[in-house]
């Protein structure tokens, strides 16, 4: 019994030592594990949030890049369309108008009407002086004078028209005032282009 009592005491002592040393260590280990789990949980949550932030940022960057690319394409398309319109205007409108004017403005009857209109405009303003009329270099002065008649040619310094250095149309010079009233084909082309260009664009490009 004495031996058992000694064993019991030894057991009690071991249990007491275990209780005093292991239990606090177990509690400390449990606390460490709990803290580690909480910290790991926070790290995982923060990692998820950071990953989502990176994804959102990448999506926004990609979206902005796409929008910039789309805007650049739209702008390039607008520039190409405008260049095409200008090319069409130059080729179809201005060149065709120029060809038509070259034909019309070299007609003696048309040249005579232009000279007559210029002389009458000067008379209507009460302007007097030596008047010199010029017609296009490809127009017959004789044919124009015949079409004008003496009523108009008598008002001209040379009693008739002279040939100028322009293609077609007419010019009237008021010498005392150093005025030149210009209705040459070149000036008429610019005038008609300005007046008709808007209508031409609307007619041709209304669906663009």
Curated annotation (Swiss-Prot):
HAMAP family: ATP_synth_E_arch. GO terms for molecular function: ATP binding; proton-transporting ATP synthase activity, rotational mechanism; proton-transporting ATPase activity, rotational mechanism. It comes from the Bacteria. This is V-type ATP synthase subunit E. The keyword Lyase does not apply. InterPro entries: ATP_synth_B-like_membr_sf, ATPase_V1_Esu, T3SS_HrpE/ATPase_suE. It comes from Chlamydia trachomatis serovar D (strain ATCC VR-885 / DSM 19411 / UW-3/Cx). Transmembrane segments: none annotated. Keywords: ATP synthesis, Hydrogen ion transport, Ion transport, Transport. Pfam families: HrpE. One of its GO terms (biological process) is proton motive force-driven plasma membrane ATP synthesis. Gene3D superfamilies: 1.20.5.2950. Produces ATP from ADP in the presence of a proton gradient across the membrane. One of its GO terms (cellular component) is proton-transporting two-sector ATPase complex, catalytic domain. Belongs to the V-ATPase E subunit family.
